[in-house]
Structure formats: C-alpha cells, structure tokens
Amino acid sequence: MGMSDLNERLNQLEQGALNFLFPRRCPFCNQHIGSKELICAGCEKKLPYTGDRAVRQTSWGRVAAPLYYEDAVRRAILDFKFKGRMGGLPCFGSLTARCAAEEFGGEFDAITWVPVSRKRLRKRGFDQARYLAGSLCVEWHVEPQETLRKILDNPPQSGLEDADARRANVLGAYEAVHPERIAGKRFLLVDDI
C-alpha cells in the first residue's frame, strides 16, 4: 500500500467517523440522509425550483437563483445565515453551481461574492456569501476571488420595502479590491438571498 493509498484510506475513515458522530441532515427538513446525499428524496421532489424562470434581467446584468425564496428554502437559508448552520452548504453550493452552469455557462472569468461589513462579520463570525461562493467553487474545483470590500455598514436589505430602496441602500457601500486585477473581467457574483 503506497502513501497516497494510505492517505485515501485515512480520509475515508475520518469521514466515516464524522458521519457516524454527526449524521448528515437534509437542510430543508432536517431528516437524516446518507453520507453522500445532499438532500432527502422528499425535498428533492417538492422544493420550489425556479426552472425556466431562474434568470431575470436587471439594469446591470442578469440574476439567477435555483430555488424560490419561500417556506423551507427561506428557513434553511436563514438558519445558515443567522444561526451558522453550515450543514446545508454542500447542497446550496451544488444547486447554485448547477443553476449558474445552466444559465451562464462560461460567460464569466471568475467567481466572487457580495461581502458583509466588518461589523457584521464580527457579530456573525463568518461571511455567509463567501462561504456560499466557496461551496459553489468546490463543484468546479476553482477558488473564489475577493473583488469587493464593504466600506459602509448600511441597514440590512431585508428591512427595505422595494427594489429602489435596496438599490439606494447599497450605492457607495462597496469598493473594488485591487481594481487592476478585475478590470475587463466578467464575474459570477454570489450572494445568499
């Protein structure tokens, strides 16, 4: 048995022990699922997939989402975002990667995320959009690129009534990190909601 075989076997044993101690759960209904599954069969059938309505054109580009933000999807995303429940990340990343591949194909040069402010990062302990971008990147074996920095701690978007108020709320809230590295490139910009 070579060193790489031994490492592979140790990784399998470690993963098996983790699955035994912390069984994987469906992020949408909390039901136990197999160690290689990302979602339970029931949720896979009944989730509110966006299907052929995944993409919407905006004044600054196209946006896409694999699922409608309602019921179990909303709960799972909020549990991830505000309670730090990371178990759903592989599922969220897989669904988002599949949606992005179908809707945007190779129309981007790199993947980035919408960062949180330093204040929210300290309070929450993690940047949920960065984690989501990272889980999507795992599917494609690439690394997300940091392109933006949030420079204003503006009010949360969730408390705003309409698209105009949300647009005004983020105006001037971000700056480019190393603008010379991103000039002329197209990015898949990942956010949680």
Regions found by a protein language model. Name each.
Residues 1-193:
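Glycine-rich phosphate/pyrophosphate-handling loop used in enzymes and phosphotransfer proteins
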